[in-house]
Amino acid sequence: MSDVKPPQHFTMNGNPPPPEFKNPKKPGRLTNHLQYIEKVVIRALWKHHFSWPFRQPVDAVRLNLPDYYTIIKNPMDLTTIRKRLENNYYWKAMECVEDFNTMFTNCYVYNRPGDDIVLMAQVLEKLFLEKVAEMPEEEYEISALTTKGPVKGARKSTIGLKKRPPSPMSEVVFQQTVTVIPPDALHTIPSAPLSAQLTAKLKNGVKRKADTTTPSASSIPSCESSSCVTEPKVLKLFSRRGSGRPIKPPCKDLPESPPQHQVGRRTKLSERLKYCNAILKEMFSKKHSAYAWPFYKPVDAETLGLLDYHEIIHQPMDMSTIKKKMEAREYTDALQFAADMRLMFSNCYKYNPPGHEVVSMARKLQDVFEFRFSKIPDEPKNANPVSSHNRVKKERARSPSSSESSDSESSSPENSSDTEEEDEEERAHRLASLEEQQLKAVREQLQLLTQTPLSKILKRSSSSKSSGCKVCTMMNSLKKPKFNSVLRRKESRACDSEEEMNTLPMSYEEKRQLSLDINKLPGDKLGKVVNIIKAREPLLRDTDPEEIEIDFETLKPSTLRALECYVVGCLRKKKNKPPKKSKIKEKDKDLQHATGEQNSHKKTKIETDGEIKDTTHPSRLSDSSSSSSSSDSSSSDSSSSDSCDSDSGLTEQKTKRKQSKGPGHANKIKKKKYYPVVPLPEQALRQANAEVKDSSSASGVMCQSRPSSLVSETGSKDLFASQHAKHPVEDITAITGIPPLLSPLTSPSAAMPATGSQSTSSSQFEASSPLCLYKDIVLKHADSWTSLGKLATQTPCTIKSSKESFQQFRKVAMEKELTTASRGLVSKHCLTQQPQKAKLECQPSKPEVESAELPLMAAILDTPKAPEPSSVLQNSVDREREMARKREQERRRREAMSGVIDMTMQRDIMATFEKNLE
């Protein structure tokens, strides 16, 4: 329900007449309190934006509130109170205050606690109580020009009150002021009950809304301050409304009068005190008045009925007293000002319970003060604070009124001065102890700040020492003595002690070398460099890591030394890692080639001895085949071995890698003593003619040397698997070189010399033709063998397994075919040139995919070389027919096998591509 009171004429049906505001039978008068309520309180409430529901009486008919006047027996509104004040309806101010309380109580009784109208009433009531607290302490009648005439008997009862000047306002602060009362004021005893009744009424109003959420008058009896309006403003108001001329009160009634004589002798405030004065002005501003008003004035314990206040609080303090001391230049340091402010808050916390409203207000105000005071500028070094002894003397020389205001329990001037001296000495001692504590805290913080970087530097130096020593021991085992001396110099420079790092500056050459070394670092190491610089340089801690610029001239020597130690360690690790990898690669390659060599020895053991194999195997390789085999190995090892050679600087490793690029790379470790240089093609031919007994063994050796130097690891595994076949044609398959079946497709020219070898009648041509074959292949199609090495390294194990299964299937088929073919083949000496010409004529017309398999079929057709020359002789016609039949059969077989091989390779290539995409 709302309590809205729109403007209305009091002639409506259903609404009772408004309360009376003029009663001739009831005597009334005009007092200073009533005048203050009319001119200050009513105006303030009327201007408030929440006052519109309370300006007129409640229109129950319009608002559809039929039970309003049944519940509310005594309605009241601001218009009625205003008219009563204008017509001198009230005899004293307490009657008007009761009307205000009735208006607010009616709102609380009729409406629910959470309604908007209730919250508006609470805000207005708080404003009303603040204004009433600023009202003068004693009430007396004044002559009003607007009134028709004084009421009978009023002059007799207010003769003494008329001559009385306005007394100081009732103030709720920490410090009680002793006011000098003139002799004629002793007859004004009836004014004291009025103050007591006003206080009691305020307390009653507080109890009524103690459960509300907004601050109320409950804070007044135990609060630490009261008003925002200063005393000169009220005096000016009284002089303006009383008579036509201002009233000058006696100087003895104004406690501010003694310090006024010192205005001409004021000294200039320091920067810190100016900042404190600004803080004080801000706390007096309207911005903080909602929770700072209880601390504006000293606590009036007698008026508020706080009889035990001065028994608990021995040193009261308030913001007005602090302001007076600031204006009187009694503060020589900002710490004294802060001590008084904190004393004021501590008194509030000490006297009031923790859950009291004024305690929460004090906490809010103290938070504001501490936040502002923490930003106070630093004190200059040449500023010397005044000694506490001189400060105590200055405090003693103050006016009697200010000394009396600091001691509320004194009954005589002597006791007051003694207590004040003790308080000042205690305060000076407390300030000295606070200064010592602050200095001690600052000292501890400085020690922590200085010790933390040192501990971090020591940890980094110890870690760099250990890592540097490990790197040094590893490098000593690899480098030459001359290089070791350079390493020792760098290591001694990197492992210097912390004292040397801090004191030893870095020369220009060292800075230039450090800059070059930092540029050599990889990208992942540069982040650590930035972290080292930020940890040691306070000015660079807030910079962006992506846009940081390093100037070595501005960095500290310790930072440069730490960077040097870190960079040297990183570069050493970078140099040590590549040789290890190259060694491992070389060992793996040696083992692989040695295994392939042993397998080749086992396969060819039937034809020749092991010793002859070891001595003739490398010598039968031509210079062209060595260049073809080196093309694959050099392409795969150039990226790693070249970089390692340039970094390590070891001549032994360079020579080893150069030798590894030759044709005997597979068995260079075992046979380096006997064959340091690869023989020329002519020497290979001589050794072949001298040691090999027949052409079949020579061709078998050549076919075997080819896969050992050109085919990858897959070919060696297939060779090893093929030697276990228990078939009579085992020697033939080993000699003809089955592993080339897994080699990539080659050009048609690769098979032409091999086919021609069948029709040769001399063994010399048979021995020399394979050499020419390999020479032509190397010179014309070296790129195909390079792609073979790349393909072998890229294919996964799944492709190898599929090749192995296909190889086994092919081997069985080939063995079966060769067994049937060997029965009807004739010797090589009786072959004519006609089949050779026919073969050469039909080969260029075949497609490229079909001709790519000619080397494989050539190896199959070389099988007649395996049987002994003393085979069964047949007629020439039968031989020609058999050869023609064989050609046609092989052609058809080639066509079928070429399609199968293409499909398999295509499938394997697609599978590899999909895996790489994943």
From Swiss-Prot:
Domain (NET): residue spans on this chain: 496-578
Residue interval(s) of motif Nuclear localization signal: 204-215
GO biological process: male meiosis I; male meiotic nuclear division; positive regulation of gene expression; regulation of RNA splicing; sperm DNA condensation
Biased composition (Basic and acidic residues): 605-617, 877-896
Keyword line: Activator, Bromodomain, Chromatin regulator, Coiled coil, Differentiation, Meiosis, Nucleus, Repeat, Spermatogenesis, Transcription, Transcription regulation
Biased composition (Basic residues): 575-584
Biased composition (Low complexity): 399-416, 622-648, 739-764
Main localization, broad class: nucleus
Coiled-coil regions listed: 426-452, 815-902
This protein's GO CC annotations: nucleus
Residues marked Histone H4K5ac binding (site): N111, D116
Residue ranges, annotated region (Disordered): 1-26, 241-267, 379-430, 575-712, 738-764, 862-899
Pfam families: BET (PF17035), BRD4_CDT (PF17105), Bromodomain (PF00439)
InterPro entries in UniProt: BRD4_CDT (IPR031354), Bromo_Brdt_I (IPR043508), Bromo_Brdt_II (IPR043509), Bromo_chromatin_reader (IPR050935), Bromodomain (IPR001487), Bromodomain-like_sf (IPR036427), Bromodomain_CS (IPR018359), NET_dom (IPR027353)
Transport listed as a keyword: no
Compartments (UniProt record): Nucleus
Domain Bromo, chain residue ranges per copy: 29-135, 267-376
Family in the record: Belongs to the BET family.
Record's comment describing the protein's domains: Bromo domains mediate interaction with histones that have acetylated lysine residues at specific positions. Bromo domain 1 mediates binding with histone H4 acetylated at 'Lys-5' and 'Lys-8' (H4K5ac and H4K8ac, respectively). The bromo domains also recognize and bind a subset of butyrylated histones: able to bind histone H4 butyrylated at 'Lys-8' (H4K8ac), while it is not able to bind H4 butyrylated at 'Lys-5' (H4K5ac).
Known role: Testis-specific chromatin protein that specifically binds histone H4 acetylated at 'Lys-5' and 'Lys-8' (H4K5ac and H4K8ac, respectively) and plays a key role in spermatogenesis. Required in late pachytene spermatocytes: plays a role in meiotic and post-meiotic cells by binding to acetylated histones at the promoter of specific meiotic and post-meiotic genes, facilitating their activation at the appropriate time. In the post-meiotic phase of spermatogenesis, binds to hyperacetylated histones and participates in their general removal from DNA.
Protein name per its UniProtKB record: Bromodomain testis-specific protein
Gene: brdt
